A protein has these predicted regions:
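Acceptor-binding helix/loop patch of EC 2.4 sugar-transfer enzymes
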Residues: 45, 75-96, 141-186
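Carbohydrate-associated surface elements
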Residues: 204, 225
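Conserved donor-binding/catalytic core segment of Leloir-type glycosyltransferases
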Residues: 239-257, 263-267
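Nucleotide-activated donor-binding/catalytic signature segment of Leloir-type glycosyltransferases, i.e.
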Residues: 286-308
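Aromatic "clamp/platform" in nucleotide-sugar-dependent glycosyltransferases that forms part
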Residues: 322
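Short hydrophobic beta-strand element within catalytic cores of glycosyltransferases
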Residues: 339-342
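Conserved acidic donor-binding segment of nucleotide-sugar-dependent glycosyltransferases
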Residues: 354-355, 359-365, 375-380
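A short, well-ordered alpha-helix in the C-terminal region of glycosyltransferases
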Residues: 368, 382-396, 405-408
Length: 423
């Protein structure tokens, strides 16, 4: 089987390409920006400040040979990165991103025909033109979406409900254009219509696709992995009643992560009982942040090597997201020995056994979240047991396991689509 993995940007596409290479099924990994000796990306990186050089260094995968990687529209891809990272260029970002996706799609569809690929795997939000072109030029090629997030059309319904329930937080929901921009909404609909099958990070992602009448028969779930060596485990001890518990949230402090419900749930808890540490970029107005209690600490962004120490010093992780496909921050919390309380709209809920390594609560329900916070405050002696169970939870979620599971899932999807076409 020959499979092409194509992404004009990055996300976790290196991981899937690696999985298929290990299985001997990778026809090519195609992208725009990638670090190779003497290419445009490496030359530009050397000419720019160290910030850009560090970002460029991340555009390389040691598991792939340079010969596995084909680059198209490299200059356009660099322009997308610049527009995304330079504030003065933000207004041009969406136009350049879309035009790059469309130009990239033309090249990949030609590659699919040239290579006689059995399947092409694109990524949600950037594959509408690719799948349409492949359907036209090589209709026998199976078109698979690797869903890095939940269905944007479903998420919009959740966000619209949240706007009505928490209007003061509504502005921070507007940052992800794929949800709101009519052009991107139309592209999402085209992408779903042109795809044959879906590789999903969680049951929640599958459920979100059912909103758009996608048949779950053509969905396969493959959970991501976690690097446990980067997140060491420390055995917890039961804290005394007079010692405050530390609850931690890891992710962007924005309403799409459900922080309004988090702050409401934590309101009125005395500092002598507990504190809430929020680690991540803050995307809320001062009119909200200035009113938070003193035991809610918005730490902001921290260095990657600091994250592990923060998780080791905490007692419980809270993750009240409105919708996340499979947040790696929860897996990092598990690896560090943190019981997790997350919403049903969080893909990592697949990994939680209530009362063992955490709890799953309804989305947009501050009362349910508060009940679980109070449960931990009243059942401190359970935390060491749950901490060990949390760490044990990630044993099955290594990247090596992902490589095997992802390759298996892709093979199943290809066979399902072929069988359906033969009927």
């Amino acid at each position: 089987m020959k499979i092409i993995v194509a992404h004009p940007q990055q996300q976790h596409s290196y991981r899937l390409a690696t999985a298929l290479k290990k299985r001997g099924e990778l026809g090519a990994y195609a992208t725009t920006v990638y670090m190779k000796p003497h290419n445009l990306t490496s030359l530009v990186a050397k000419a720019l400040p160290s910030f850009w050089e560090k970002k460029a260094a991340g555009r390389h995968c040691d598991e792939l040979d340079d010969s596995d990687v084909l680059q198209f529209d490299e200059a356009r891809g660099l322009a997308v990165l610049f527009c995304h990272n330079i504030p003065l260029a933000h207004s041009r970002y969406d136009f350049i991103r879309r035009s790059t996706e469309d130009a990239f799609a033309e090249k990949i569809s030609e590659l699919v025909v040239r290579e006689g690929a059995d399947a092409v795997i694109g990524y949600d939000g950037c594959s509408a033109s690719l799948f349409e072109k492949v359907r036209e030029l090589s209709p026998e090629t199976v078109r698979i979406v690797d869903m890095s997030a939940a269905n944007a059309l479903y998420l919009r319904t959740v966000y619209e409900r949240d706007e009505a329930l928490k209007p003061e937080f509504a502005e921070s929901l507007k940052g992800w254009n794929r949800i709101w921009d009519p052009i991107d909404v139309a592209r999402t609909k085209r992408e779903l219509a042109a795809a044959d099958a879906f590789l999903c990070g969680s049951e929640f992602v599958v459920n979100s696709l059912e909103y758009s009448e996608i048949n779950r028969k053509f969905c396969e779930i493959c959970h991501y992995g976690v690097d446990t060596e980067s997140f060491p485990y420390r055995q917890r001890r039961g804290k005394e009643e007079e010692e405050p518990l530390t609850f931690v949230y890891l992710g962007q402090v924005s309403e799409h992560k459900g922080v309004a419900w988090l702050f409401e749930a934590f309101a009125g808890i005395e500092a002598s009982r507990a504190s809430l540490l929020c680690v991540g970029d803050v995307n809320l107005p001062e009119s909200i942040t200035s009113k938070l209690a003193s035991n809610i600490d918005l730490r902001g962004m921290v260095q990657h090597d600091e994250v592990s120490n923060i998780l080791l010093s905490a007692d419980v992780m809270l993750f009240p997201s409105l919708g996340d496909g499979f947040p790696l921050s929860i897996m990092e919390g598990f690896a560090s020995g943190l019981p997790v309380v997350c919403t049903e709209n969080t893909g990592a809920a697949d990994c939680i056994v209530d009362g063992e390594n955490g709890f799953v609560v309804p989305v947009q329900d501050a009362g349910a979240l508060r009940n679980r916070i109070e449960w931990f405050l009243s059942n401190r002696t359970e935390i060491p047991r749950m901490a060990k169970a949390a760490r044990d939870s990630v044993a099955a979620y290594t990247w090596d396991a992902y490589y095997e599971n992802a390759a298996d899932a892709v093979e199943k999807l290809v066979e399902k689509v072929r069988h359906e076409r033969e009927r």
